[in-house]
Amino acid sequence: KLANALGAEVTLFTRSPNKEADARRLGAHHIVLSTDDAQMAAAKGQFDLIIDTVPYVHDINPYMPTLNINGTLVFVGFLGDISPMVSTLPMILGRRSVAGSCIGGIAETQEMLDFCAQHGIASDIEMINIQDINHAYERMLKSDVKYRFVIDMASLKV
């Protein structure tokens, strides 16, 4: 949503074709199924910037060739040590780089909140009652979660 509102042409890399409808609703212009070799080959050299939001260790090597010369893959999720998994050849030959970024401070956060308010951008969440927290946790373990869970504090009995 944010990248689209900022005027970027947005492409979603996904392992699941089931995410296409939501991705388009959220502002993606293009979808690349990362498990499809033909789609990944067609995306070669297409991107100046990839923002990697995946919050667990995964192989980034298939994505490096999709970066243009001087392109950058930026991690915003903490993965820990990925060094044994990264091939430097595509980075050296394509002048590609890998970077990391954290959430901004108070001023940057307020700026983004103001931008979201001006553009009608809100988070997509799944509201749950506190009584359903164990079920939500089980769903999370099974990767049966579409959006972030948010606990309805009104359901908390004091």
Please provide the spans of the model-predicted regions:
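Conserved SAM-binding loop of SAM-dependent methyltransferases across substrates and taxa
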Residues: 1
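Helix-to-beta-strand junctions that scaffold the AdoMet/dcAdoMet cofactor pocket
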Residues: 67-69
